[in-house]
Regions:
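Short active-site neighborhood of thiol/selenol oxidoreductases, capturing the structured segment around
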Residues: 56-75
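N-terminal Sec-pathway targeting helices
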Residues: 2-12
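N-terminal "domain-start" segment that seeds a small globular fold
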Residues: 27-58
Length: 175
């Protein structure tokens, strides 16, 4: 019992440090890779949207594309949706197109129901193993790529990110 009481201050200190790290975001799982100094061409892709219409990467040349790998069951992915809706409205006239690649295994019906309830204002395409591999494998979801008007990857982030922080990554690519 005395040993436990002697260690109590250390346990309290460890708990406080853990809480501070979590609150500061240092423990966040979001990872962003800056490609801005590189010319890394985004892979070409072609996928079907929820209406069965083909969407191809070459149709988006000249636009800034946010390509987000996600799933309806992913909590962090769902948390980012209101921000993406806001960014699509705010920057559409500057050439922004958000395209979300659903990795849901249950098929488009599940995704269609989710989209109808959430008010998403950007295209959703159904992903497959081919696009995941083309983008170097998806370490986790959400995984998001910012692709510039010339088709080069400028940013990659893994994990959820607050809208304001993501907008700071996006704005230089839109300019």
């Amino acid at each position: 019992m005395k040993k436990m009481l002697r260690n109590a201050p250390l346990l309290v200190l460890a708990a406080i440090i853990a809480a501070l790290v979590a609150a500061s975001g240092l423990g966040s799982k979001t990872k962003a890779d800056d490609y801005s100094d590189q010319k890394t061409p985004a892979p070409a892709w072609s996928l079907m949207d929820l209406a069965g219409k083909e969407i191809r990467s070459d149709q988006l040349k000249g636009k800034v594309v946010v390509l987000d790998f996600w799933a309806t069951w992913c909590g962090p992915c769902r948390m980012e949706i209101p921000g993406y809706i806001e960014l699509q409205k705010k920057y559409a006239d500057q050439g922004l197109t958000i395209v979300c690649v659903s990795l849901d295994q249950q098929g488009p019906g599940v995704v269609q129901r989710f989209v109808a309830q959430s008010g998403i204002n950007y295209p959703i395409v159904m992903g497959d193993q081919k696009i995941v591999e083309a983008f170097g494998g998806v370490e986790g979801i959400p995984t998001t790529f910012i692709i510039d008007r010339d088709g080069n990857i400028r940013e990659k982030k893994v994990g959820a990110m607050p809208t304001a922080q993501f907008e700071k990554l996006l704005k230089p690519v839109l300019e």
